[in-house]
Amino acid sequence: YLCNFSVFQSLLDHWALDQLFPIMPIHRLEVPPSREGTLVDITCDSDGKVDQFIDFEDSRNTLPLHEVPTDEHGKLLHDYYLGFFLMGAYQDIMGDLHNLFGRVNEVHVFLDPDEPCGYYVEEIIQGTTVGAALASVQYDQHELKRRMKRQVDRAIKADLMKPTEGRRLLRDYDAGLSGYTYLSA
């Protein structure tokens, strides 16, 4: 399964030391998994894979997963979520900004039998934006936007672009800078 994360960024000790972390589907829990699979990430180095998983008594080479429905063109009909557990701050700090992906979205969930659903969400931490990742390597997003606007204005003035196209391009550029560094639907 191709996953929207970086093993080196988020599971550094798995990559470097073969440490195993609990991983399981957190989506479609009412349906038993029907497939076995391994996980690969979206990074360019082809080194981001998880092919060892915690089992009841030992480890295993595959993870029980669900089939993910697609349309007739192979496009996913809905997202499929996996939980990576017990990673902690050390993994975040050591992974730093590898590949400029930055931090993934994170949810801190605690089990509590006194809660109606048996758990509560303590905190939701949003992942790194493209603008924040670029800022970490000294690119100012306001300056990038200013330069893009100048290029669009020149293209419009030279009749290479229509004003509506220019506005759409600038809107999309701004949305890209404020968007998540990982893939989004």
Describe the function of each predicted region.
Residues Y1-A185:
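Charged (often Lys/Glu-rich) extended helix/loop segments that serve as interaction or gating elements
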